[in-house]
Structures are given as C-alpha cells and as structure tokens.
C-alpha cells in the first residue's frame, strides 16, 4: 500500500493556478476575509521545510504582521467560529493560494537552501562529495605509478612500451568481452512488460511522485517539455513537477512561466550561489519535493507516458534495498544521418544490453544522468 502524502492538498492543486485562485477567492468570501493572489512576507521572514510543504500558513516579518491562510474546505467552519470569538485580528488575516504561500516561503528560505545545496554533502559526508577532486591517496598512487613508468622506461624503454600496450589490450579486451556477454544476455532476456504499470491503477493507491527538471539556457525546449510531462500517466493531484531555473536565465524563466499556465507545474528559481550546475540545482530542490519517489529529466527528454507507472511497479516487485532505477534512453533525431544512427546504436547497446547484464551480475551501474528514479524519500 502506498504511503499517504502528509501534505496532500485537495484536487485544486492539480487544476492549475487560475482554478486554484478561484477556489480560494471563494473561500475568502465565505470567511469574510480579503483574498490576495500574491504573498509578500517582507525581509527575514521565518520559514522551514514543513511549512513549505504544508503551504497553509505564513506570517509576514514586517510591521504589518499579516497572516496568510490557505484553508481547506473542511477547516472553514472552525475558522468562522474562531473569527467570531476573536474579531480583532480579522484585518490582519488574508487568504491566498497554497502556490502563492509556498512560493513566498521558498523565497524566504532560499539562501539557506542554496548554501546547503553547495556545502551540505561535503560537510556531512566528505567522502561522497566531488568537491575534493583528488584525495591524498589518489595523488600519491598516481605519482607512484608515474615514477615506476618513468624509471622502467629509462632502464628498458622497449619492454616498457610492450608492457603498457599489453595492459591496455587486456583492458580493451575486457570491455569487448563484456559487450559480447551483454549481447548474449539480451538475446535470452524475456520481452518487456506489455501492460505497463497495470499492477496499480487506482489514484488512491499511488504515492506522490516528484519530477525534477533542471534547465539552463533552454528556452526553446520548454514548450515541448511541458507538453510531454502533461501526458505522463499519473494522477495530476499526486504529481509534483518542478522546473529548476537559474535566476540569471531570464529567457528560460519567461518561457517556463508562459508554458506552465493552466498546469500545476512549479517553477523554482535557484539563487546565484556557488556553481551553476545541475547537481546544485537538484540539491536545492530535493528538500522541497513532496513525493515518496522522485525522477530527474533533462529539457530534451520526452518520457514515455507510462514510465512512472512502470518504475513504481518495478519498485514494488524489487527487494527493499533497491533505491534507484535507470530507465532506458532512446535517441531520436528529427533529421537522422549516419552519425545519429551510430549514436542511437551506442545508446541501444548500453541501455538494452550492457546495463541489464551489469545488473544481473550485481555490478555497479553507471547512471545516464537522466530518467533516474529514486525511492525512499519519505
């Protein structure tokens, strides 16, 4: 049974910003409070991850001391009773949408999120971080090998060249042998699942699934990306799509804001702290994900509509220690040529043959950098 999202909101989240605003404007009218489409918390407003996920309440930090609410329909009777007993604060209470409150709370915490994205891993788990490119042991090992090669070449140059070539030949032969093994394994593999994800169909049985898409200088790809993500076969109220944009990339920000109109997709602006890289953008967004599962796509990706259901079904059938799945990536070119066909063959060999045999042998898998699915976030 899927875990329930503790921050799950009613279905208006999935209907788009316009419908969401209309719903909360009506709730403001029923409460006798003002509705505001945008939330201004001022400088130094308090914000934490739980408040961002809930997106039901925020307090401004300036002299106005305004309180912004995004009440569920079921909460309205209790709020009316509270207002009747406490009429004085009514003027400082405003109703807004969860999207507007969430955006304001993220903005209030963005410096902390950005700082954590840059340094949290290297501080907490330095051996898993790439901030230090070469360790002391690696540097010493490299120097030792170089010294041995230089010494051997000075004493017996011909024998050294032969030895280096033999070692290289063995390594290249190993790669070739792996591909032959992979080809034989692929020929014996059963066909892929025909009924993708049919083990789970009811929306109530599905968890919230987060989709992260980091973008940089890719404004021309945004419309096609949004159309492809809109076709994903997953209940829209249980889909958490976040487009991650750099604050200096104005063209892509403008294209994204235009493309996501009428959807529940969220735009996250990554502050200009540290490097403008895909890992930093993903680390910035990860604490804000609502989903128990998360996948990463690139701007040029056009995921199969059934990919999330297939991934979730695979997680359900897999041992609990399986935390990541790599989807197959198929290369498509609008104007194919010889080079693009060779590229497509290379990708097909990797994702349809080499990676499956590495998985069957229990060996480490090189991830493709996109279409990776992760579980166990909640």
Name these PLM-found stretches.
Residues 13-85:
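Polyanionic, low-complexity intrinsically disordered segments
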Residues 83-119:
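Extended, hydrophilic extramembrane loops/domains of integral membrane proteins
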Residues 107-203:
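N-terminal membrane-anchoring/stem segments of glycan-assembly enzymes
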Residues 177-211, 215-238:
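N-terminal signal-anchor transmembrane helix
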Residues 230-274, 316:
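Acidic donor-binding segment of Leloir-type glycosyltransferases
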Residues 260-264, 269-287, 305-378:
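Long helical/loop segments within the catalytic core of UDP-sugar-dependent glycosyltransferases
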Residues 294:
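Short aromatic/hydrophobic "clamp" motif used to bind/position activated sugar donors
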Residues 298-302:
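The conserved acidic donor/metal-binding loop of glycosyltransferases
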């Amino acid at each position: 049974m899927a875990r329930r999202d503790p921050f799950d909101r009613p279905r208006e989240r999935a209907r788009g910003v316009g419908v969401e605003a209309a719903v909360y404007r009506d709730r403001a009218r029923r409460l006798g409070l003002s509705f505001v489409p945008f939330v201004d918390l001022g400088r130094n407003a308090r914000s934490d991850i739980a408040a961002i996920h809930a997106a039901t309440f925020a307090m401004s930090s300036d002299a106005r001391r305004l309180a912004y609410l995004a009440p569920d329909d079921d909460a309205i009777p209790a709020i009316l009773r509270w207002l009747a007993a406490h009429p004085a604060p009514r003027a400082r209470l405003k109703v807004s949408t969860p999207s507007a409150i969430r955006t304001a709370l993220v903005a209030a915490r963005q410096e902390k999120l950005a700082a954590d994205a840059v340094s949290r891993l290297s501080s907490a788990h330095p051996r898993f971080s790439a901030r230090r490119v070469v360790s002391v042991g690696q540097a010493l090992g490299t120097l030792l090998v170089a010294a041995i090669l230089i010494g051997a070449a000075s004493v017996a140059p011909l024998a050294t060249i032969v030895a280096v070539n033999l070692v290289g030949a063995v390594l290249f032969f190993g790669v070739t042998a792996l591909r032959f093994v992979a080809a034989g394994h692929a020929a014996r593999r059963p066909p892929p699942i025909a009924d993708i994800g049919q083990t789970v169909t009811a929306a109530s049985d599905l968890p919230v699934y987060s989709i992260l898409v980091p973008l940089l200088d890719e404004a021309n790809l945004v419309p096609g990306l949004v159309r492809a993500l809109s076709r994903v076969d997953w209940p829209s109220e249980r889909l958490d799509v976040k487009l991650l944009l750099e604050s200096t990339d104005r063209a892509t920000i403008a294209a994204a804001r235009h493309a996501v109109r009428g959807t529940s997709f969220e735009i996250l602006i990554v502050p200009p702290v540290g490097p403008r890289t895909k890992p930093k953008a993903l680390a910035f967004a990860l604490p804000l994900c609502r989903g128990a599962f998360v996948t990463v796509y690139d701007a040029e990706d056009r995921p199969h509509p059934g990919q999330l259901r297939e991934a979730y079904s695979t997680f359900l059938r897999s041992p609990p220690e399986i935390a990541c799945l790599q989807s197959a990536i198929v290369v498509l070119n609008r104007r194919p040529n010889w080079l693009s066909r060779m590229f497509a063959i290379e990708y097909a060999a990797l994702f349809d043959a080499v990676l499956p045999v590495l998985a069957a042998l229990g060996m480490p898998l090189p991830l493709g950098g996109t279409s990776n699915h992760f579980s166990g976030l909640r």
